[in-house]
């Protein structure tokens, strides 16, 4: 399959009256950047972790390209250190007696690692519900409440697979369109296949929403296809959760009400003020350290202070079609509205032609192909009727 590049644009401006520490995975090739990292560390995941110090009004901005996501890599054996890393016990994805007992119950009579992982995949998809935002993050709370978002589905899948000795990692990234459109999923390592993709939360949404197939990509029409395959329209920021921060993150002694706490395993966690035993819960794409002890009374913290902002844009013919959709939608709706007020065969032709072009863009991009194929056929027939009247 031909690769289709995306442009990732990340931006962080320090608008606070203090210096900010920021950790961020740095791609090997950057298109442009405004600041160089003060330190650069190689992570066990193979990524480079950049450490930045941003003073008041400093801006970090960089762009880079990413190819169409695929987990298929050369089947390179994991080193002992890598295997241990992807089998580790963490706060968000624990490996303990409870997870081992559950994993064994799910996989009774199943011997191969691939089949065990697929049984776990099916179990989670069938027995848990998607909910955003989740009440609390982490496997402990997910097992209790039986619902959560993409991260919780991924944490539990990692936890159960690791409990059976299957190297697993939780990926954090973004859908390849729009702004701040985050997502999390998994990859498992199999000796004869290498790393393969698994998206439990998308499979769950596909299975439990009977009309979801109308919105599906052709490659993942059936929910079980999300074991070993994705639609590819996503980019990766970091290749596991709980990545140790270097240099070390010093937890704040007190917590500020300026930041609403995140719940992790039903315990308040203050993003940007503490770590999980020296690690960021996840890098999507950044983690910051903010000193809130000297905040003025009316100081408020927004998402842009905690994460920065990112957007992903497609290039090439897919990018052209994505942009065309916006303009075609405006033309189609505007001309349809005018035609409704003042009926005119030429306006009717224009809005129907615009809708035909718009629906064609969706089909060519393989976005909701069944739904828009139906719309396209209906609109083409209607357009032909209008043309016949004009003639």
Go through each PLM region and give its residues:
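A structural boundary/capping signal
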Residues: 159-163, 319, 336-339
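Canonical alpha-helical transmembrane segments of integral membrane proteins
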Residues: 325-340, 352-358, 379-382
């Amino acid at each position: 399959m031909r690769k289709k590049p995306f442009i990732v644009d990340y931006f962080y401006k320090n608008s606070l009256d203090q210096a900010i520490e920021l950790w961020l995975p740095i791609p090997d090739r950057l298109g442009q950047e405004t600041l160089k990292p003060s330190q650069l560390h190689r992570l066990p995941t193979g990524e480079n972790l950049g450490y930045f110090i941003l003073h008041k009004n400093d801006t970090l901005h960089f762009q880079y390209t990413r190819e169409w996501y695929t987990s298929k890599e050369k089947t390179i054996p994991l080193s002992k250190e890598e295997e241990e890393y992807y089998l580790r016990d963490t706060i968000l994805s624990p490996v303990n007696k409870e997870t081992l007992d559950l994993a064994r119950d799910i996989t009774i009579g199943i011997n191969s690692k691939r089949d065990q992982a697929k049984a776990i995949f099916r179990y989670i998809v069938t027995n848990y519900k998607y909910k955003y935002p989740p009440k609390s993050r982490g496997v402990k709370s997910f097992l209790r409440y039986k619902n959560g978002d993409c991260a919780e589905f991924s944490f539990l899948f990692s936890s159960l697979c690791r409990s059976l000795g299957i190297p697993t990692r939780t990926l954090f990234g973004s859908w390849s369109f729009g702004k701040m459109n985050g997502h999390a999923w998994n990859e498992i390592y199999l000796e004869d296949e290498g790393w393969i993709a698994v998206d439990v939360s998308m499979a769950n949404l596909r299975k439990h929403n009977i009309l979801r197939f109308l919105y599906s990509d052709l490659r993942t029409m059936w929910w079980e296809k999300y074991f070993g395959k994705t639609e590819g329209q996503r980019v990766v920021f970091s290749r596991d959760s709980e990545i140790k921060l270097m240099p070390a993150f010093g937890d704040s002694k007190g917590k500020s009400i300026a930041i609403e706490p995140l719940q992790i395993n039903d315990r308040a966690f203050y993003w940007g003020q503490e770590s999980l035993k020296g690690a960021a819960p996840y890098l999507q794409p950044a983690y910051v350290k903010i000193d809130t002890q000297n905040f003025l009374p009316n100081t408020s913290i927004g998402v842009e202070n905690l994460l920065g902002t990112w957007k992903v844009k497609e290039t090439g013919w897919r990018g052209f079609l994505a942009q065309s959709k916006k303009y075609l939608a405006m033309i189609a709706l505007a001309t349809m509205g005018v035609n409704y007020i003042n009926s005119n065969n030429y306006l009717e032709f224009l809005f129907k032609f615009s809708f035909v072009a718009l629906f064609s863009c969706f089909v060519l991009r393989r976005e909701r192909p069944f739904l828009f194929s139906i719309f396209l056929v209906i609109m083409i027939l209607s357009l032909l009727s209008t043309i016949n009247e004009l003639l």
